[in-house]
């Protein structure tokens, strides 16, 4: 009998501190940086974001999302036999945030590791977890995207600091006799390393050089729309499906213009896209599971529907996962 994996529970968490565009405009104004709510909304679609308190780490956010996902799945932490955390902002250089999360959950003993593919991280992690479940290396996986991007933002650069927020999203993936995760497609192209990066070097546990995010927005935009379309068509071809067969498109919540451009290329209406970007900004690896959980809890995304998840991130990395909920 063939073995598959299926999502049986979702969860998400946003830290309490919520900054609207007006709040951020006021804070930046104190630094002599000019921007406006209109400028931010027009260019990004973002209206608010959440920032974690200084003593809150990625694993803390991951813990809250993981508990909700386990609750939704009707499982205990001890039922989990694999933990993968997608993050670019781990608690420390090592050990992995996944190991720290494992201890906080009380799920000690199972394999636990981090996966770093920036904003593509959750799609990568979900694909890896699916492969391990299909291979029999795990029966019940916890896959989390968690980020505290507020720690690596340059608040003197209005083109980047308005984009990102902190948060976490999680899913529980369980072995199944019927297909849940249908297929995935992952890609990377290292020649684009410099267009989205934190260029500092880590030495002795300290970041040397430039420790804040740098982005060539125009280059990212042009590349993102093309590779997202490629990834979507790749997974659809593997499954023998067409865009019209997809009930919901759940993209990385990066920028509304990128999301609209992708929908146009796939000839899918925005009414079939889950959009939560306006309320939490770009939360990197956390954005897709955040959007998925929100849509599930709102009753928009329902069991049996076909979902297309797609992401693009620094590296340059990109990918897509096609699944039935």
Curated annotation (Swiss-Prot):
It is found in: Cytoplasm. It is an enzyme of class 2 (transferase). Its main location: cytoplasm. InterPro entries: ACP_syn_III_C, ACP_syn_III_N, FabH, Thiolase-like. It comes from the Bacteria. The active site is at 119, 252, 282. GO terms for molecular function: 3-oxoacyl-[acyl-carrier-protein] synthase activity; beta-ketoacyl-acyl-carrier-protein synthase III activity. The keyword Glycoprotein does not apply. Pathway: Lipid metabolism; fatty acid biosynthesis. GO terms for cellular component: cytoplasm. It holds the Pfam family ACP_syn_III. Keywords: Acyltransferase, Cytoplasm, Fatty acid biosynthesis, Fatty acid metabolism, Lipid biosynthesis, Lipid metabolism, Multifunctional enzyme, Transferase. GO terms for biological process: fatty acid biosynthetic process. The keyword Transmembrane does not apply. Its EC number is 2.3.1.180. Belongs to the thiolase-like superfamily. FabH family. Homodimer. Catalyzes the condensation reaction of fatty acid synthesis by the addition to an acyl acceptor of two carbons from malonyl-ACP. Catalyzes the first condensation reaction which initiates fatty acid synthesis and may therefore play a role in governing the total rate of fatty acid production. Possesses both acetoacetyl-ACP synthase and acetyl transacylase activities. Its substrate specificity determines the biosynthesis of branched-chain and/or straight-chain of fatty acids. This is Beta-ketoacyl-[acyl-carrier-protein] synthase III. It comes from Verminephrobacter eiseniae (strain EF01-2).
């Amino acid at each position: 009998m063939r073995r598959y994996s299926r999502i049986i529970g979702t969860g998400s968490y946003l830290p309490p501190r919520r900054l609207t565009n007006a709040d951020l405009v006021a804070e930046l104004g104190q630094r002599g940086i000019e921007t406006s709510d209109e400028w931010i909304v027009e260019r990004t679609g973002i209206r608010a974001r959440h920032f974690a308190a200084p003593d809150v780490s990625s694993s803390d956010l991951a813990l809250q999302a993981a508990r909700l996902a386990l609750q939704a799945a009707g499982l205990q932490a001890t039922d989990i036999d694999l933990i993968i955390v997608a993050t670019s902002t781990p608690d420390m250089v090592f050990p992995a945030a996944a190991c720290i999360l494992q201890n906080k959950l009380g799920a000690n003993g199972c394999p636990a590791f981090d996966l770093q593919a920036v904003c593509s991280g959750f799609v990568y992690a979900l694909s890896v977890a699916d492969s391990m479940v299909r291979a029999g290396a795990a029966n019940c996986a916890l896959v989390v995207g968690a980020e505290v991007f507020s720690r690596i933002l340059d608040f003197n650069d209005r083109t980047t600091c308005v984009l990102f927020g902190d948060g976490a999203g999680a899913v529980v993936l369980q072995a199944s006799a019927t297909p849940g995760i249908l297929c995935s497609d992952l890609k990377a192209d290292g020649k684009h390393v410099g267009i989205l990066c934190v260029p500092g070097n880590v030495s002795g546990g300290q970041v040397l050089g430039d420790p804040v995010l740098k982005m060539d927005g125009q280059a990212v935009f042009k590349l993102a729309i093309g590779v997202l379309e490629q990834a979507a068509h790749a997974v659809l071809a593997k499954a023998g499906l067409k865009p019209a067969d997809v009930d919901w498109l759940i993209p990385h919540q990066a920028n509304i213009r990128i999301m609209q451009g992708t929908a146009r290329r796939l000839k899918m209406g925005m009414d079939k896209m889950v959009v939560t970007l306006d309320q939490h900004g770009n939360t990197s690896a956390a954005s897709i599971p955040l959007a998925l959980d929100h849509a599930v809890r709102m009753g928009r995304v329902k069991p049996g529907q076909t979902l297309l998840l797609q992401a693009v991130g620094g590296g340059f990395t990109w990918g897509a996962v096609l699944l039935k909920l």
